[in-house]
Amino acid sequence: MASRPTPARCACASRGPITANVRGRIAPSKLAHFVRKTSRREEMSLWYQTVLEAEVILENENFSFLTYDEEHHRVAILAMPGLEPTPPNAAGTDHIAFTYANLADLLFTYQRLEKAEITPYWCINHGPTTSFYYRDPDGNAIELQIDNFSSAQETAEWMASGEFNKNPVGIVFDPDELIGRFESGVPVAELTRRPPLPEGVSPFDMVRL
């Protein structure tokens, strides 16, 4: 039998996070980029260009520098021949997440990627976010998401309510059904509100790998 999830503690309780600067600390001003090392640089570069609508800043047989915003590069792909696949049980980064401005943009992106034969392996409402998970050609997980609440404080209040402790995974959903409801005019607040777990279902039953 699976063990029960350990209740999470929210250090910021219901007030929302306090930035390091407000706390009088010197901290990074932003997260700059991430780097993938791969033996299939061209394929990986094209995948990230497609998924993120990124453009190539600089590219040759050794590397690709990509960006989708004002940063000089958000993603770097390094060519390293002969690499072995990362074992599923290896320690390391689980996934990297990208936030969209609204549900319409997220659903449009899902449809655009589906036409490019890039489909999510996991669609889930975590509570704080509505999320689509994808795997790049090397099997690394990428999350495309929206925030379900309008502010960090609202998210913190929801998490402090105990709802996240009850279900720290979320509720899976059918993306095409979600699109149908969205196009029929169901309010976004209702579409992104996380429903309760079905009777007799564990949070761990919602995991997709």
Where are these regions (language model features)?
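Alpha-helix termination/capping residues and helix-transition junctions
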Residues: 25-28, 90, 115-117, 136
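N-terminal "first-domain core" detector
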Residues: 15-16, 22-65, 69
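Conserved short beta-strand elements that form part of the metal-binding/catalytic scaffold
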Residues: 55-90, 135, 141-149
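Vicinal oxygen chelate
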Residues: 12, 36-43, 97-209
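Short acidic N-proximal helix/loop "leader" segments that mark the beginning
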Residues: 1-28, 184
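Eukaryotic phosphotyrosine signaling hubs
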Residues: 31-33, 91-96
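Generic hydrophobic, aliphatic-rich segments that mediate packing or membrane embedding
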Residues: 89-92, 109
